[in-house]
A protein has these predicted regions:
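Residues in well-ordered beta-strands of folded domains
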Residues: 41, 123, 196, 205, ...
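C-terminal effector modules of nucleic-acid-centric enzymes and ribosome-associated factors
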Residues: 253-256, 264-344
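Sliding clamp-binding short linear motifs
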Residues: 1-162, 229-231, 240-244, 248-251
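Short, compositionally biased low-complexity segments
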Residues: 82-101, 258-267, 302-308
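Hydrophobic, well-ordered secondary-structure elements that form the walls
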Residues: 23, 122, 173, 221, ...
């Protein structure tokens, strides 16, 4: 809080910071340490400064220093010089002359690395969410988000009705942590898996064959579509001559996993584009043909032509084109105001 207040106060009193060097010159080095500046850098606080980007701060600047180390040393030297001149016989009225060190110009961090840094240093994603590029897959191929899944697990686990169990649900998320540890008895291992989506998190504990079946997918920062269900737990009751198995709760199981990056090619069987009859003309047909030809794939393409006035619709299947539900095609359909359906 003290560091933030120090930055805000300096900006309020003396105006906006002109560049990264101006920031280092003006903000007291005793108030904002290296960790604080690093957090500001990777959360995007300096993105408006053209002379540096987030990738530059960790770059080797020579002599065992990073760019951030170089900037901190520069700021500290500048402020010590300013303080020395202020207390000198000359009264500090002269302008301080310094040579600003050159900064390496690097490509910006890729988005995944940038977002990982934001989460690591700030505790949240700021610029975007890593799952943003999979919104299509999540919208069309999941049955619930993770908070809803957690509620579903609690509800089913509390049931004593056998019919409530073993029903497949589809969830998606980013793997946030994977811990593999030996079992207490020393016989094999177990895995604690945590994933997150836009709204929350959930976790799994996997043993033996359940873990082995999906272990190849369980890597931090992997994007997964998971088919999951709640299996019943049983306990026995009654005496030794008349034992009865009763449901005593539930346990989460993973039926299968697919990489979100593969969903469009492997799971989109058909795309149906709804087309109102009154909008179909030569221009629309020409533009639609261009959009479809740029997104060739393996999914069947169909058109549902409907007449609102007479309440009639006819579906046509394209024999010439198969498509991939690419971002480019989806953006064009949205811009054209055409609704589409997947696997329906």
């Amino acid at each position: 809080i003290g560091a933030v207040n120090s930055i805000i106060e300096e900006r309020r009193n003396n105006g906006p910071f002109n560049d990264i060097f101006n920031f280092m010159e003006r903000v007291p080095s005793t108030s904002v340490n290296k960790k604080g500046i690093e957090a500001l850098a990777y959360s995007g606080a300096f993105d408006s400064f053209p002379e540096i980007n987030r990738g530059s701060f960790a770059m080797d600047a020579g002599k065992g220093e990073t760019c951030l180390d170089l900037l901190i040393r520069y700021g500290s030297l500048y402020q010590k010089t300013a303080e020395s001149m202020k207390n000198s016989l000359f009264g500090g009225g002269d302008e301080i002359e310094t040579v600003r060190p050159p900064l390496p110009v690097l490509p910006e961090l890729d988005q995944i690395e940038m977002l990982k840094k934001e989460k690591e240093l700030v505790g949240m994603y700021i610029s975007a969410h890593p799952l943003d590029r999979f919104r299509f897959e999540i919208e069309h191929f999941t049955t619930m988000d993770l908070p809803s899944w957690n509620d579903y697990v609690d509800k089913v686990s509390a049931s004593r009705n056998r019919e409530d169990f073993d029903k497949d649900q589809w969830i998606a998320g980013l793997v946030s942590s994977v811990e593999v540890k030996p079992k207490a008895n020393g016989n094999g291992v177990f895995c604690r898996l945590s994933i997150e989506d836009f709204k929350g998190t959930t976790s799994f504990v996997l043993f033996d064959k359940d873990y082995e079946a999906v272990s190849g997918y369980l890597r931090p920062h992997e994007f997964l579509l998971m088919r999951v269900y709640v299996a019943p737990r049983y306990k026995s009751s009654g005496d030794k001559n008349n034992k009865v198995l009763e449901i005593s709760g539930g346990r989460v199981k993973i039926r299968s996993i697919t990489l979100l990056a593969n969903v469009r090619e492997s799971m989109v069987r058909e795309m149906v584009i709804d087309m109102p009859l009154e909008r179909i003309d030569a221009e629309l047909r020409k533009n639609l043909k261009k959009a479809v030809s740029r997104s060739k794939g393996k999914s069947r393409l169909a058109f549902n032509v409907y007449d609102r006035e007479n309440r009639i619709n006819v579906e046509f299947v394209s024999r010439k084109y198969s498509v991939l539900a690419s971002d480019e095609l989806l953006r064009w359909l949205d811009a054209a105001g055409l609704h589409y359906r997947i696997n329906k």
